[in-house]
């Protein structure tokens, strides 16, 4: 996020007509001294994925699966790729909310998981400390930035994604908060954590209680969002066919729909 570009070049990189995002990124002018200016730059994160694939011959998803996802018990992960088959890196990873929580717990535990040291504590500390100042209207986006991690108030750090996806780690409170949502008010979500959850935390660990633990598990198992009923007589078959899109920044050309009885 401090590549030296004066503004985020991601849209230009991702919309390059030939789909060669690496070449488009490397052709950009670098107006500032690298490391001197924070500019949020998803294309730079994509370049990290491209470099890893060049060196290992594996996509970022394939590289992480045996080293991170499998040990954490994360299954079914998918990652979007660019037109040249490189994992997009800065976006497009699909995992469950509880998998996000596992990732945060791994960092909270300084890289240790079920007796394995998946990441070094030194790397955890280095990646999550502030390396550069950032400036933003929203308070939670001007606390500094590490290696792909935002610094937060209350000596916390987080990874986040568009429209309210969060992995927030509070080492001093021994707490991880994982959220998947659809909202434009991401600062409001963060404010809710600080104003509601944080004051409710006890100063020390609760005594172990098998009964209360079982009650908690039962409560968690009962939580679900109800599925909306299907509309009868909707006749979805009328939408079957192939649809061609106009030229767009996402490089999407067409979509096809078919329905089975």
Residue ranges and their predicted role:
Residues 1-74, 95-111, 119, 124:
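Active-site-adjacent helix/loop patches that line small-molecule binding or acyl-intermediate pockets
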Residues 5-6, 45, 85-87, 100, ...:
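Solvent-exposed loop/turn segments at secondary-structure junctions
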Residues 28-34, 44-46, 82-89, 152-156:
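Flexible glycine/proline-enriched surface loops and loop-helix/loop-strand junctions
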Residues 32-40, 87-94, 158-166:
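Solvent-exposed loop and edge beta-strand segments that line ligand/cofactor-binding
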Residues 81-88, 111-135:
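A beta-strand-loop signature enriched in Asp, Gly, Thr, and Trp
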Residues 124-177:
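Active-site Gly/Thr loop motif
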Residues 161-228:
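Structured C-terminal helix/loop/strand segments within mature extracytoplasmic catalytic/sensor domains
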Residues 207-261:
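Peripheral terminal and inter-domain segments
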């Amino acid at each position: 996020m401090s590549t030296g570009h004066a503004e985020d070049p991601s849209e230009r990189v991702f919309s390059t007509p030939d789909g060669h995002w690496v070449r488009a990124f490397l052709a950009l002018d670098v107006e500032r001294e690298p490391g001197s200016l924070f500019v949020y730059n998803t294309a730079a994160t994509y370049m990290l994925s491209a470099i890893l694939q060049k060196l290992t011959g594996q996509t970022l998803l394939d590289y992480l699966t045996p080293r991170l996802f499998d040990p954490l018990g994360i299954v079914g992960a998918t990652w979007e790729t660019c037109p040249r088959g490189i994992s997009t890196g800065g976006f497009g990873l699909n995992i469950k909310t509880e998998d996000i929580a596992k990732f945060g717990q791994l960092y909270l535990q300084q890289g240790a998981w079920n007796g394995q040291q998946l990441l070094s504590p030194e790397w955890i500390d280095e990646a999550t400390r502030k390396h550069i100042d950032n400036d933003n209207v929203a308070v939670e986006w001007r606390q500094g930035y590490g290696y792909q991690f935002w610094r937060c108030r209350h000596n916390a750090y987080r990874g986040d994604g568009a429209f309210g996806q969060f992995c927030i780690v509070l080492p001093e409170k021994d707490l991880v908060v994982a959220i998947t949502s659809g909202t434009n008010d991401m600062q409001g979500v963060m404010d809710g954590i600080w104003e509601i959850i944080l004051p409710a935390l006890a100063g020390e660990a609760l005594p172990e209680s098998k009964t209360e633990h079982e009650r908690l598990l039962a409560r968690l198992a009962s939580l679900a969002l109800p599925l909306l009923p299907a509309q009868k007589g909707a006749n979805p078959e009328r939408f079957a066919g192939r649809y061609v899109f106009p030229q767009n920044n996402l490089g999407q050309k067409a979509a096809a729909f078919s329905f089975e009885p």
